[in-house]
């Protein structure tokens, strides 16, 4: 028995998973509450589970293209089988030749190996230009060379079996499953029926089914005609080749039914042809599957913004498109490393960015902390559906209720209007008629107004206008400065030298001293003059008194 494929997760990925799991165990994750945000033009459109993955699992599907018919019916179906066999060889021989050229390009000399590989790739590409993806695919094809050789050793036994699904493990380094969609048809139609069929009917049935399968093969390998062996096969193509038997390999590799539908939609399950043998009509495909780690309690929340009415015009909230929350921590999630499906995110790494306190407060329900940008124009869709209801900006469009008839008006200062079946059963918005089935309960906040201070300018045109105003102000300031410089140029520089300034200061001090002394002297003279006046007045009064006394005598 061969060894089973390793499903161990690499150390760097395991470290990432452990860190994320530790964070997720701090506190259960709560999704962002969209009820207080809806009336502010911020709509929570949905959540997705966050998973981390690496493409580390591989298995092989050996597609048995030529079925084995019962001995008593081989002669009846010989003609359609021979035609089918010739068509298969014509269709798939370029694929087989391309695979062999690339695998045989490996030499023991290190210097010429890369050159031979690139030459083999370019030899199989129509335009003569090998892309990075094609070089990567060729390298993977070379790595699978030994496994393909091991499968070819068993080709006779695989071709001889009548089983539609057969697990091949002898001498193989990874799980391999031989499947035959046509063999399944033969077994169901001829081997398990007691009804006798005439030879013509057998030939017709086999011919029709083989033609249908050839059509599927042409659809699958259409892109391979221009660059054989270098294009990945999608999961849909693998199912076309293997039919329902594909599930057997996926189950063996540990893909459960609960993950299968999501992984199929992600495009992470792919296949690469690694061999084609025209003698036995066997086609080997190496299937690559992801190892997926589920991050408990980590969800990605998607946010959409609606153009709202403000006193400064139409504006939209400045919030991230995708955020993730673990406990009380909310951060922006970078989905450029992720593949999205309807319910899941599959990421090679988790990258988050911290948010400003204002945005954090806004997403926590404090709508007065939300900031808005005047970037949305009047042609932006002014409404959004959510859970059977509508959030609309009835300032930008006419919200006409068909049943019951009426116009839904948006009060002055309100950012948006929340419309549900309670207020309108059938709503017409710009020629689009919607039947409402949802309801906004009392927990939804309404009548939210956006203050002027919450609206900022971030649009390119608006910023250009503001920059123009700033440039005008700067130009005016430069003109004033130039005028001031002209006035300063008229000043005699010699009068402003250091020695002249010292002289001016000394002279000023001397002048001040003389001025003070003069003031003191003037005050003294005035005081002395007043004293003399008093003395003369006193002498005059005494003389007058003496004269009066002499007259009386």
UniProtKB/Swiss-Prot annotation:
Single biological process term from Gene Ontology: symbiont entry into host cell
Residue intervals annotated with topology Extracellular: 32-500
Top-level taxon: Viruses
Keywords: Coiled coil, Disulfide bond, Fusion of virus membrane with host cell membrane, Fusion of virus membrane with host membrane, Glycoprotein, Host cell membrane, Host membrane, Lipoprotein, Membrane, Palmitate, Signal, Transmembrane, Transmembrane helix, Viral envelope protein, Viral penetration into host cytoplasm, Virion, Virus entry into host cell
UniProt record similarity statement: Belongs to the paramyxoviruses fusion glycoprotein family.
Protein name: Fusion glycoprotein F0
Subunit structure: Homotrimer of disulfide-linked F1-F2.
Segments passing through the bilayer: 501-521
Signal sequence coordinates: 1-31
Coiled-coil segments: 142-170, 466-491
Membrane topology of this protein: Single-pass type I membrane protein; Single-pass membrane protein
Role of this protein: Class I viral fusion protein. Under the current model, the protein has at least 3 conformational states: pre-fusion native state, pre-hairpin intermediate state, and post-fusion hairpin state. During viral and plasma cell membrane fusion, the heptad repeat (HR) regions assume a trimer-of-hairpins structure, positioning the fusion peptide in close proximity to the C-terminal region of the ectodomain. The formation of this structure appears to drive apposition and subsequent fusion of viral and plasma cell membranes.
Residues in the Cytoplasmic compartment per record: 522-553
Main location: virion
Lipidation (S-palmitoyl cysteine): 523
Record site feature (Cleavage), residues: 116-117
Glycosylated position list: 85, 191, 366, 447, 471
One annotated Gene Ontology cellular component of this protein: virion membrane
Disulfide bridges in this chain: 76-199, 338-347, 362-370, 394-399, 401-424
Gene: F
PTM info: The inactive precursor F0 is glycosylated and proteolytically cleaved into F1 and F2 to be functionally active. The cleavage is mediated by cellular proteases during the transport and maturation of the polypeptide.
Record region (Fusion peptide): 117-141
